[in-house]
């Protein structure tokens, strides 16, 4: 029995060495300061700065509770990802872990679903940039697609720079986002604490009871809203991808992940609670940042414009992060055969430029959407982005569970940074993600149509697999086979034939 366990551990170690070879070519240039801010900035994006306006209209004060629920499960997902990162840091993130624990088919599905997430998220971000620019009346007559194309050009160029420059830019982008929220929290708390009226109206808890209570539209709209709020946390897993280019991921990643949970509570829940205590929830509008709405009503010259510049930066930051992620995820998939061979190419600056360019091509579709249906593009694309992130998070949880199993069986070394309450919290998180899919079906028409598109996505994934499986088989013919990996055996047999 001991001999079998030792043999299984040796096979698993051999596969890890093969997977680690996929990381060659990256420049380990990210420091602790940058990783910390990337983790924080990943949790603060367009979903809060722009999406919160429409969400307050739909759920009222209950939005704070929705953010809290989603935030707790986001923390579980981050801790699960942290386990995987300490097991084996990888720029391929959970796609590489899916390849290790679930096989190449799972890595193929995980990778392309994550690509769907970031492809859709990028379209949301360039749409957000265009909407923010229309805040200024001077640009009111400029078509939305022009700003979308401009944002795409700027960020696409930035992503071709080396990772050190990306990390530094993302640090400052994230810092601006954090400072914006902190300034709002300080100014809003002063107004609330001193009892100063805002636009002639008193602030305080009465604004909740005077405007329909905590659930002004009932419980069901608040529950359905969970599927939209999930998008607000869609970048938290960025820290997993960044771990592959960290100087010391074993120390940096746990510290960064543990800092996220209380910041989610402060920035998301605290901000929404403060927003509804300062103004009636129905004073906020879809299409305009609620923070811009608040500062504009202070009567201070240019404060609304300054805040609008901040949230514009947030959208560009999210777009920048998306291109960073997809370039590396597509390269990881290409190394395993699940994506075209050219996507594995690296530039002299150690940047996976081919994957980034492929993503930019998809983002151009977003520019056309801004031209064709500018008023609906944000909500249409938001649902598809949520679908992609739900699938990605589910793969993270399943891989974490398989890692625990491998550790228990002696195939992998134990890790010091673990998901609290696992496996209960692992199963609970998977149940939560499944419930989000169910809730999406009730969000008619966009959510309903998104769920209805699942069979089409499944057909496309199956068709795509038949297109790549020969290359996958060729690559896996020389890859180590773990004791429990029947898929690799099948792939090798296919390659032999």
Protein language model features and the residues they cover:
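TM-loop-TM module centered on a large, flexible mid-protein loop between adjacent transmembrane helices
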Residues: 96-98, 103, 135-139, 208-212, ...
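A generic transmembrane alpha-helix motif of multi-pass inner-membrane proteins
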Residues: 380, 384-392, 419-497
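Extracellular loop-to-transmembrane helix junctions
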Residues: 26-30, 50-147, 157, 260-263, ...
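Membrane-interface loop-to-helix entry segments
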Residues: 144-202, 234, 257-261, 382-395, ...
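Hydrophobic alpha-helical segments and their helix-loop junctions in multi-pass secondary transporters
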Residues: 176-210, 273-279, 393-410, 467-472
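C-terminal membrane-solvent junction of multi-pass transporters and transport-like membrane proteins
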Residues: 343-353, 393-444
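Hydrophobic, membrane-embedded alpha-helices of multi-pass small-molecule transporters
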Residues: 30-49, 151-154, 208-269, 274-275, ...
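Membrane-interface "cap" regions at the ends of multi-pass membrane proteins
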Residues: 1-53, 57-62, 75, 79, ...
